[in-house]
């Protein structure tokens, strides 16, 4: 039976989401996305063209694929800005699944402004959007976002683009326990093992951009991320053994040859 990721009315068989930033061109973005097997790609609509048909348009590369464009509000610092932006995007493209991202610290950490995020989430969800909300790794905030109508919560693993990996593994577990919507670990993934760990902790998916786009070989890293997410998910579903302080022999003691 297929292991489906369901976000609102949308369903996906891949649990990896990729970003579109920091690539040299749209062609490389497309090639890496296809290699990753991802079925969603985030697009910062204030920076990447998806609405003007008279300019090079990222949508042209994906129009014949099954990859869903996921507009995000990167660059927005208030709920009002994000709400206005997404309404314009839906009017221009018809896309209603979005990544809500409202930054509180634009200089150093790029941490989210969770108060503005919750405000925007409630308005956008009531307006018919399927909202995937970028947030900190706090289970209380995650629950508030779910109550505000978020179809998925996206706690950061570490600061955006840092490549530090998951800095607080317990919080990923706490967020997962706190909500009944998918949890997508977002930001800070640096390599394939980070993605696998996120999935083994119980995350429903992983979003990564910089780790692929700025790798020495983006296509190869995209493929590595694909298999890391699959392996991590399978490991989580299989169930890990408990940790013990002492050794346990793997071979039975019965029937041993006596000397």
From Swiss-Prot:
It catalyses: [ThiS sulfur-carrier protein]-C-terminal-Gly-aminoethanethioate + 2-iminoacetate + 1-deoxy-D-xylulose 5-phosphate = [ThiS sulfur-carrier protein]-C-terminal Gly-Gly + 2-[(2R,5Z)-2-carboxy-4-methylthiazol-5(2H)-ylidene]ethyl phosphate + 2 H2O + H(+). The keyword Ribonucleoprotein does not apply. Its EC number is 2.8.1.10. It is found in: Cytoplasm. GO terms for molecular function: thiazole synthase activity. Its main location: cytoplasm. 1-deoxy-D-xylulose 5-phosphate binds at residues 161, 187-188, 209-210. The active site is at 99 (schiff-base intermediate with dxp). GO terms for cellular component: cytoplasm. Catalyzes the rearrangement of 1-deoxy-D-xylulose 5-phosphate (DXP) to produce the thiazole phosphate moiety of thiamine. Sulfur is provided by the thiocarboxylate moiety of the carrier protein ThiS. In vitro, sulfur can be provided by H(2)S. Homotetramer. Forms heterodimers with either ThiH or ThiS. This is Thiazole synthase. It comes from Nitratiruptor sp. (strain SB155-2).
């Amino acid at each position: 039976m297929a292991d489906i990721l369901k976000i609102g009315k949308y369903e996906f068989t891949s649990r990896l989401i990729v970003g579109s930033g920091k690539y040299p061109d749209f062609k490389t973005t497309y090639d890496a996305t296809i290699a990753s097997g991802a079925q969603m790609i985030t697009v910062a609509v204030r920076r990447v063209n998806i609405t003007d048909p008279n300019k090079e348009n990222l949508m042209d590369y994906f129009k014949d694929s099954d990859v869903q464009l996921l507009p995000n509000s990167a660059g927005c610092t208030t709920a009002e800005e994000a709400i206005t932006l997404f309404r314009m995007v839906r009017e221009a493209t018809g896309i209603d699944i979005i990544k809500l991202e409202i930054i509180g610290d634009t200089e150093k950490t790029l941490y989210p402004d969770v108060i503005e995020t919750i405000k925007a989430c409630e308005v956008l969800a009531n307006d018919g959007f399927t909202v995937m909300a970028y947030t900190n790794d706090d289970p209380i905030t995650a629950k508030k976002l779910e109550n505000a109508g978020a179809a998925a919560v996206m706690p950061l693993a570490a600061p955006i683009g840092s490549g530090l990996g998951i800095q607080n593994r317990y919080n990923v577990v706490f967020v997962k326990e706190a909500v009944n919507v998918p949890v997508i670990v977002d930001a800070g993934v640096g390599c394939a093992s980070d993605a696998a760990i996120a999935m083994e902790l119980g995350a429903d998916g992983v979003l990564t951009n910089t780790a692929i786009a700025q790798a020495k070989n983006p296509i190869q890293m995209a493929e590595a991320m694909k298999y890391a997410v699959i392996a991590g998910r399978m490991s989580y579903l299989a169930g890990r053994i408990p940790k013990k302080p002492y050794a346990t022999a793997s071979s039975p003691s019965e029937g041993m040859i006596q000397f």
